Amino acid sequence: MAREVPIEKLRNIGIVAHIDAGKTTTTERIPTTGKDIQIGEVTEGAATMDWMPQEKERGITITAATTACYWTRNGERYQINIIDTPGHVDFSVEVVRSMKVLDGIVFIFSAVEGVQPQSEANWRWADRFKVPRIAFINKMDRLGADFYRVFKEIEEKLTIKPVAIQIPLGAEDQFEGVIDLMEMKAIRWLEVTLGAKYEVIDIPPGYQEKAQEWREKMIETIVETDDELMEKYLEAQEITLEELRKALRKATINRQLVPVLCGSAFKNKGVQPLLDAVIVTYPLPIDLPPVKGTNPNTGEEEERRPLDEEPFCAYAFKVMADPYAGQLTYIRVFSGTLKAGSYVYNATRDEKQRAGRLLLMHANSREEIQQVSAGEICAVVGLDAATGDTLCDEKHPIILEKLEFPDPVISMAIEPKTKKDQEKLSQVLNLSSLKEDPTFRATTDPETGQILIHGMGELHLEIMVDRMRREYGIEVNVGKPQVAYKETIRKKAIGEGKFIKQTGGRGQYGHAIIEIEPLPRGKGFEFIDDIHGGVIPKEFIPSVEKGVKEAMQNGILAGYPVVDVRVRLFDGSYHEVDSSDIAFQVAGSLAFKDAAKKADPVLLEPIMEVEVETPEDYVGDVIGDLNSRRGTIMGMENKGNITVVKAHVPLAEMFGYATTLRSLTQGRGTFIMRFSHYDEVPQHIAEKIIGERMAGKSS
């Protein structure tokens, strides 16, 4: 079956920004041809890209909604697959897992607030995934909008080379359109059409000098990336528009430059040129290097080129529960084709699975298709897959690199209200924790039997509980949020574990001696087999490691997991008859417990990176409050009459901070908080936490 859209007419893009910079509104404004789509307003709770009830109520994006739309440029029809991602830090996993499947990203910046914290964090992720970018300075119609200030912030804060290919025609309530520095024409949107139509005019006299100045800057910046053009430029030869565009595209794909455009998505101004820039400057799927993975049968590295004739290979980047279709698995096809109803091989799980219906998505509406090909994105009904799984041709197996997600930093106890709720809850938590959201986990406390849910922040858990009620009709009682403490050690120690059990028949014998030492913070766990002379047979070495890991999960001081430890197994003994896997597991566990209590164990707590934006009048009160929360002020930055206070604060001290900040700043302050690192809890506080924890376990 021939593909509907040629691969060279396909673009896969993400829309990423800080919360409230206008991502969803921008996506809503991207028009489609052949479909009558009603434009929704985020401010009215009607945006179609924000389709979950919680998103409509809060005016923020929680999940990464996908939409396929079409754009015609110079008579050629293109398909643009767009992923609109959350700006709230509690849902940044949606941004990260989208990065792997995108060919380019449009970063939205507010012309008023400029470069904000979550944008910086997401920019670093884009660097890691080597994704080309375009910057769109939005909200040019707002009071305080300043294109030139934000352009400078992009250059300084993100340490990249931006190149303005437009400058604004007016600002704030005088914002009319943009000046195209390539064509040296002004584009003015007609208010009477609500921005649906525009006119191309000569640059007004009052803007000609600034336009010429910025065009020169644009040309200089672009030619610096191309030796041939630089030579022509230095020799004062004419550089054609086609040469400039070609060089800009190459520099964008190679991540040497970031084109900068501007507009007001809310007023529907600037979106059409943004789409043109996506078509002209972003890479085609066939421009990208082959994806690399591992053949599970041979262990050797293999690659797949973005061609339909290559063996099928796709990456599951998102899994969602749909109330009507069941599980939806969103995939990006890197090579080959997949037909509806055919079988695929889930190489990650070593399972053959049937792909039912294939759906082209527009937020929460959908269009059924019969085939998906290289470079395309779709949702598949019927697969039992999880985020990060590789789907492929069974005869040509490959496993692509899986994403690593941060551990949750906050937990909360939940209790079903009725027996009926109890029965449904385990099924829902299994889907949410294992497949749908890799940063959300559900566990059962082995001592109390309580169900604990774990996530990236208060809002994250609040949304999950709300979804249980709305989508599955499950009512739960919710406990207070709890901090995900951890434990570690400060010094080296040696420990011995010996497990001997004599019964009437065969006994049990395991004996292990280990040395433990602290690792740098965040390094996790290392196990070194340093056994010589066969004092412990090789088949029992993994048993010792398993026992050590089990003991680490149960903690030293208060039952919290132990992290950042190196364990060296260097001695022990065994019995020809009585030694067994379980005996050496117990020996390993006992050895770790023996060593750990001598290694100066300490309690660790999550430290959050907090950024508070407040009017100048309240800075003193804000800093005083952060200090009272054991915070360390890391710096301050002025943005007009707004001051940004940056601090490191223990998560345990940040519960309920939103209410306090509203009170301190008369509702005018805002803050963002994200995980930074783990650090030691001060001794007097640690003693209290340990005491309360142990009292809870004994009661």
Swiss-Prot record:
PROSITE patterns: G_TR_1, G_TR_2
Domain of life from the UniProt record: Bacteria
Domain tr-type G: 8-286
Signal peptide residue numbers: none
Major localisation: cytoplasm
A GO CC annotation given for this chain: cytoplasm
InterPro entries listed in its UniProt record: EF-G-like_DII (IPR053905), EFG_II (IPR041095), EFG_III (IPR009022), EFG_III/V (IPR035647), EFG_IV (IPR047872), EFG_V (IPR035649), EFG_V-like (IPR000640), G_TR_CS (IPR031157)
Function text: Catalyzes the GTP-dependent ribosomal translocation step during translation elongation. During this step, the ribosome changes from the pre-translocational (PRE) to the post-translocational (POST) state as the newly formed A-site-bound peptidyl-tRNA and P-site-bound deacylated tRNA move to the P and E sites, respectively. Catalyzes the coordinated movement of the two tRNA molecules, the mRNA and conformational changes in the ribosome.
PANTHER family per record: RIBOSOME-RELEASING FACTOR 2, MITOCHONDRIAL (PTHR43261:SF1), TRANSLATION ELONGATION FACTOR G-RELATED (PTHR43261)
Protein's name in the database: Elongation factor G
Source organism per UniProt: Aquifex pyrophilus
